């Protein structure tokens, strides 16, 4: 969602520094490894930081028109995010994209193991009674592509800059969300 449907707004280095997490360490995994008392306080701090960013979210160019086009063509749309679900809802609302997703179609770290674990994709596939071979995971980061690979769905790497850093984990590359309507048939 962040960096895919919405313009990238997270400075993860700054967030790690605010949370006193070592540079380059995945944030959720670092919190999971902390002693419980520190982990709880760090989760609350992370939530506050993420919520502030969520309220400032802006959509990617063509996000709304692409989602509307895909829905009109019968595609099922879902969100799998490493954010908490209330943060995802705030992000979608601020970006003007809430209307494209039901609550059940927005899955965050409070409902499943975080990406790259494929559990959230499996939940969406089950909800839709869909087959992995006719599904895709669209994302801008390695965790998105790994989750898609781990679930055996098509992986779509979105990078407006054209920096496709993980070709071995990518089935389709796009630089604009509007390309999805052509790429997904």
PLM feature spans:
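Active-site neighborhood of HAD-like aspartate-dependent phosphohydrolases
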Residues: 1-38
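Substrate-recognition element of Asp-dependent hydrolases with the DxDx(T/V) motif
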Residues: 63-95
